[in-house]
Amino acid sequence: ALQRLSAVGLVHTNGRKGTNVARLTMPQLLDSFLVVSELEALAATQASKRITKEQVSTLWTHQKDCEKAFSANNPDAFCIANDLLHGTILKVSGNWMLQDYMRRTLILAPYRRHITFQPGRMEASIEEHESFIRAIESGNGLAAATCMRGHVNALADGLSDFLYFLDQTGLSEIIASKE
């Protein structure tokens, strides 16, 4: 299990020092969000060309689950529904290499989760989801990519608020120091 986690970058094995949860430096974190933004934009573009009516229905179901989680003020349920929504788009893209690269971005999950908990982020995500789902549904790859890129970049924009939160709560150790 640790080898699988290490393969996707979620843990680092340091010989006799043992295995530790991976932490990203600030430049690595910013670079990672930039790459994820482009990968998800590509997934949205390809999904807009390949999606079926049943898959569109699945996207809207996940979106409704996000709305319910927001209404219930349940960020955990929101994160699950959000992951299912994004995962469905990735699957619909049908691009095995893109799917493989996206698995490598699992290292960002804890950071994305903390950003999602920031005030106003869930509500904004719901509106952003509707925009890229409509674009995918209509087959407009350019609009789908633009909307998705904006959605993921909004997470990176929320990074400064997240960093302030970490500093104020004393949780800044989840960010790696330069080595």
Residue ranges with predicted function:
Residues 1-45, 49, 160-179:
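Short linear motifs at protein or domain termini
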Residues 17, 24, 47, 70, ...:
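Short amphipathic alpha-helical segments at helix-loop
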Residues 16, 39, 61, 124-127:
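Alpha-helix N-cap/N′ positions at the starts of helices
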